């Protein structure tokens, strides 16, 4: 599976045939970097580029170069037919001044779209006809001036955009063959293309397809085990680093398809070739560094590994959550997941997945809702705020226990009441929390606090049982109005107001609206 938006350059056979033809035009024996006029040998004397002058000064040399290049440009535009260039130009032409004279130094994209490109090809063709030694090449000049990566990127981009296909493909072929003739390894080309500096976006770069084409060319010409996965693994610094790159690339629509394919290939190698086990990958991906690793992108990679590992080993009971719980413990993991605040949807989905796995493990282990209440360490202070993720976690586990979403007022009230020690204790704690908020100047929070919410839920249950306000002391607090505590009296007073409000007959709108 490939992400590339363009077709593969061509088959290797076509490539070899076309390049043998293209070499007559572009030449492919030029060294990676052509010497420029400022390059001085050790004896500090500049090389002669033009034979029409024998001056020894630097200024004279440059004047000769300029004059020769002007003549060169005119001849190239005229077709350079039947002209003996060997009489006035050297066998080692500099890339910079030549490209400048042909006005091809304003960027590789502009150069490919310029009509002067054809003139340059004509010049190089005639030059190579007269020069039987070190042949010049258009692609060599471009790579010397712009760099291998910029040239490769521009050529592939132009091909995808439907540029002059004959010229573009000829130059692409020439670049690949140039690397091959210089014995560049696929790792060398990865470096030349500067893919590592692109990070995960390298997977969406046109240069990635160039690298893939070169790998196929190398495989076709010699026995090798090179592959895109192997090259990227080494290029990005190892399997762990590549896994991190791929985990990030999965989140971007531009790179997701190729990232998933490469990730699958990498995991398949771990499982079927390297025979690694979950504990090895857990450490390899550095998920053992601390609880913050729960939100690491590589958790996705680890989860994919476990799925493939379990498929290959049916007796395996490895799970994502078990690895974290084994190291950090149930409480620490549950707390970390409860208070996690992901910045993106992908990480939020990861937290939800891990929580669900933990809930299922608790259910399989017979863990009660009351045990989870204690595990989450829910206490008085948790009633003071408008929201608290501990209650969300408890609610999520209750839903798992029932295999459906319980009505919040039923399942949660029962679980929280039991957690606090019964309805009477929950009533006292909610009353205490409300008084605490009012006494400390947070009356505005009182009406929206968790304490107020659960107090009203208790009142709703008592009203449904047809419990009268006068009966609260005996049925709930097992006391009397005379012996009740201040918090019990405050609760009874509030329930009395609630009872009256709900016992009052509904108001009937007696207003008469005249017809219009």
Curated annotation (Swiss-Prot):
Motif RxLR-dEER: chain residues: 48-63
Keywords: Host cell membrane, Host cytoplasm, Host membrane, Host nucleus, Membrane, Secreted, Signal, Virulence
Compartments, record wording: Secreted; Host cell membrane; Host nucleus; Host cytoplasm
Induction comment: Expression is induced during host plant infection.
Signal peptide span: 1-22
GO cellular component: extracellular region; host cell cytoplasm; host cell nucleus; host cell plasma membrane; membrane
Similarity annotation: Belongs to the RxLR effector family.
Domain description: The RxLR-dEER motif acts to carry the protein into the host cell cytoplasm through binding to cell surface phosphatidylinositol-3-phosphate.
Function: Effector that enhances P.infestans colonization of Nicotiana benthamiana leaves.
Protein name, as recorded: RxLR effector protein PITG_15127
